């Protein structure tokens, strides 16, 4: 169903966003 598909896409985007945020945080800490 479309709802399930969108939910899956949202989960994937959230996972990628978290990964990027973690990497960004590590870079900021390393730069200080």
Curated annotation (Swiss-Prot):
User: Where are residues bearing Glutamine amide located in the sequence?
Assistant: 32
Protein name in the entry:
Dermatoxin-J2
Its main subcellular localisation, reduced to a broad class, is: secreted
- Gene Ontology terms: cellular component: extracellular region
Q: In which tissues is it expressed?
A: Expressed by the skin glands.
Q: Where in the cell is it found?
A: Secreted
Q: Which residues form a coiled coil?
A: none
GO terms for biological process?
Answer: defense response
Which family is this sequence assigned to?
Answer: Belongs to the frog skin active peptide (FSAP) family. Dermatoxin subfamily.
């Amino acid at each position: 169903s479309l709802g399930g598909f969108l939910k899956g896409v949202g989960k994937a985007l959230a996972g990628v966003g978290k990964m990027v945020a973690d990497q960004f945080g590590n870079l900021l800490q390393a730069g200080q």
